[in-house]
Amino acid sequence: MKKMTINDLIKWKQEGRKFATSTAYDASFAQLFESQEMPVLLVGDSLGMVLQGKTDTLPVTVEDIAYHTRSVRAGSPNCLLMADMPFMSYATPEQACENAATLMRAGANMVKIEGGDWLVDTVKMLTERAVPVCAHLGLTPQSVNIFGGYKVQGRDQEKADRMVKDALALQEAGAQIVLLECVPAELAARITQVLDVPVIGIGAGNVTDGQILVMHDMFGISANYMPKFSKNFLAETGDMRKAVAQYMAEVESGAFPDEAHTIA
């Protein structure tokens, strides 16, 4: 597997080539994903729930993400590695730069931050200082207490239009990837079409340029809850490597997510 860069993903978008991504948290699973040539991995703050047993992502720290970023980088030297910026680690642009530097030194190629156009100055400051950014829109789990739970975002026209404007503003500020979570497929398609940068979806239909799943959902080992948009690929294959290969193949062909795993 060759070393992946953002330029590869931009080229794939231009060519109409879809790609699959996953969360990862340790060297062993990162090595498994690399063996199947998974192009992008995310050290997600979802580790707070799937590894630490918390009820949400808010307790996760920069140090937690940095530790797991080092582990994943050791197992997958060639993936494009994104690292989540945890809750309140980017409240100001200056704070974001300091914490992003920690994650980049740990082996990340890009940081992911949650929020809309209020992050424009932060994205500008990060990218001007050589930190690539993935902007996360839609259901942003760090805002669970504002949303009143994990709910689909962008159903009404006003909120959908706002999300499109946010995506364009963040792209203009320098974001090189946009991640959409739990938004109607029609809205995800609209955003994917208007942006030049790659769009990765989770619970956002199959029109986005890429898809991402939480690793534990892909293997059917999440403790309490399987989201509608997730699929247990291990149950169908009985082998983790085959499960990853099937997930990637179904994303690349457009077979996943199908209607049963899509939010209308």
From Swiss-Prot:
CDD domains: KPHMT-like (cd06557). GO terms for biological process: pantothenate biosynthetic process. Its cofactor is Mg(2+). It is an enzyme of class 2 (transferase). It holds the Pfam family Pantoate_transf. GO terms for cellular component: cytoplasm. Its EC number is 2.1.2.11. 3-methyl-2-oxobutanoate binds at residues 45-46, 84, 112. It comes from the Bacteria. Belongs to the PanB family. HAMAP family: PanB. Homodecamer; pentamer of dimers. This is 3-methyl-2-oxobutanoate hydroxymethyltransferase. It comes from Vibrio campbellii (strain ATCC BAA-1116). The gene is panB.
